[in-house]
A protein has these predicted regions:
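Flexible, compositionally biased loop and terminal segments
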Residues: 1-238
Length: 238
């Protein structure tokens, strides 16, 4: 367990963790399996990690499930991902029973009516949960989020010449959610890939070569303990 092994004090825990769930395809390829098998394995890891973050006291977890750029992938792979999402929403673990609040971030208008109905139900069913706030970034892109937010403000008559950082933040998908303290990226890649690019201005980063389906509670422990040792100055000095 995290607290017994490393004795990370609750006040040293990151309040908000963001995870770029990467490496499903490579995991499957290494095993001679279709990419869909990697996504299925990654979905199980997602559920396990969400439960663990809730258990150790993380307040917010945002996972990058499907980007605006992922539509460029082969249709059969996209269809497999959407089926996994549907199966998760209909048949899989009910996070509401574990006091986890579920919220979806992204341009959901491009999804099917059925998926949107299931997403709304998942959000409504968990809205009173007081444990982990689990944000699932779906058809999400950081640049797209900013553009849509500015467009929405312009449509609502906001004087953009007087726009402040706080006003923009208040119109993002993440409005009301604190900025991430820690961004985790598995799979050996060292980039943000358009994930929470506005919100992560002062986030700490933690990278690992481990592919997402192999990611475990021990990796969360390692990331959280590394975070606890860092000196966050937010551009100032101490």
């Amino acid at each position: 367990m995290l607290f017994k092994k490393k004795k990370v004090l609750p006040e040293k825990l990151p309040q908000h963790i963001g995870i770029i769930m990467d490496g499903n395809g490579r995991w499957a390829k290494k095993r001679g399996l279709p990419r869909s098998a990697g996504h299925s394995a990654g979905a199980k890891t997602f559920q396990s990690i969400a439960r663990y973050c809730n258990k150790i006291g993380i307040k917010y977890l945002t996972v990058y499930a499907f980007s605006t750029e992922n539509w460029k992938r082969p249709k059969d792979e996209v269809d497999a991902i959407m089926k996994l999402l549907r199966d998760y929403l209909v048949d899989s673990v009910n996070f509401t029973d574990e006091n986890i609040k579920v919220k979806f971030l992204g341009n959901l208008s491009m999804l099917t009516d059925e998926l949107n109905r299931l997403i709304k139900k998942a959000e409504d069913d968990s809205k009173n949960a007081t444990g982990l706030c689990l944000n699932i970034a779906l058809n999400y892109g950081g640049r797209d989020e900013i553009v849509r937010s500015v467009q929405k403000m312009a449509e609502n008559g906001v004087d953009l010449s007087k726009l402040t950082e706080q006003e923009l933040s208040d119109h993002l998908y993440t409005a009301g959610i604190p900025d991430p303290d820690l961004i985790i990226r598995p799979s050996g890649e060292y980039r943000l890939s358009n994930f929470l690019i506005w919100q992560s201005a002062y986030a700490e980063y933690w990278f690992t070569d481990r592919l997402w389906p192999d990611f475990s509670e021990k990796d969360i422990d390692s990331a959280v303990n590394a975070f606890a040792l860092r000196d966050r100055r937010y551009g100032g000095t101490k």
